[in-house]
């Protein structure tokens, strides 16, 4: 993490439980990020907080640190807790899994058990883990409600509630589910509630604050919505040139770790086919991909076994993937906020990144709203049609996927 990205607030100077403080120190957490520096003094004192900051600024560690501290300082050694004491709700199952992974080192050091509850698969496995005992339940609203209604878990011992990517949960229509679960917990006055998100509209704050106890609202205002370390670039390709331009730019940029976003599953499959045929180590992440496959793809991408991930917006929110060097908007998103969320995959934690967008015949109409929202025009670049790569015959999903270890090659072309 870049030093100029951090604040002057040290974790060691905060009123942290010794186990949490020492564990963070062993993991190399010395200085807080700005959102951590502002939120932790509030949450460590048991006061509710709603924090807004750009993706990749340390929101997850902000609420995990406060959660473990609160549980350690509010436990009775003479009591056994048969039900969860903390509930962390995420907008997607991938985000829930990543939060669980991030919490693992703290859970081990603190002697607290975490468990996952999300839809898609693993119902019995998740159930068995919960029945073995859980202190911190991390999941999505639907599966958690299932377990509550079945009597598998009770929420009457909850001491901490976290809503992560809160605006996304509201956008997805989870407001009734959230309220159902919060009403099953102890009242806001006797629990700690934390709400974090990259964007937080007034409407969302108003809805969420009904179930919080006089929360303090904090915001880390970026220099610009898209992050000043992200180099943005815009092309105006014809529909005929669009795919060839993508492949050509891939060869020119040669990204170490890249996400390509498109607006539909069909378009993502098409992009995957051409990139795979061109010899790239590429994975496909859409809503139709089975849960186990999705998690496997994310792990391969994170571990560096895949260089490119082609995704719909299901992957745009909450995924904590470090070292993404490039983001391609093959299609400009219909929702202007999704542009910010997409390119927020790169330029994280003080690193630099590149965002390249195509304003094609179909989606160029989305550009004015995006530029109005981000507060600046995206620099335009030109290309020469005759310099574009010739398209290979694309792979189709019904054909065997090339081995993940397939070596990428460079195609040579005249610029």
Curated annotation (Swiss-Prot):
Binding site for ATP: 53-60
Any one annotated GO CC term: cytosol
Residue ranges of the motif Q motif: 9-37
CDD domains xrefs: DEADc, SF2_C_DEAD
Gene Ontology biological process terms, A to Z: RNA catabolic process
Cell location: Cytoplasm
EC assignment: 3.6.4.13
Motif window: DEAD box: 164-167
UniProt xrefs under SUPFAM superfamilies: P-loop containing nucleoside triphosphate hydrolases
InterPro entries: DEAD/DEAH_box_helicase_dom, DEAD_box_RNA_helicase, Helicase_ATP-bd, Helicase_C-like, P-loop_NTPase, RNA-helicase_DEAD-box_CS, RNA_helicase_ATP-dep_RhlB, RNA_helicase_DEAD_Q_motif
Keywords noted in UniProt: ATP-binding, Cytoplasm, Helicase, Hydrolase, Nucleotide-binding, RNA-binding
NCBIfam families tied to this protein: PRK04837.1 (NF003419)
Subunit structure: Component of the RNA degradosome, which is a multiprotein complex involved in RNA processing and mRNA degradation.
Family membership noted in the UniProt record: Belongs to the DEAD box helicase family. RhlB subfamily.
UniProt-recorded name of the protein: ATP-dependent RNA helicase RhlB
Lineage: Bacteria, Pseudomonadati, Pseudomonadota, Gammaproteobacteria, Pasteurellales
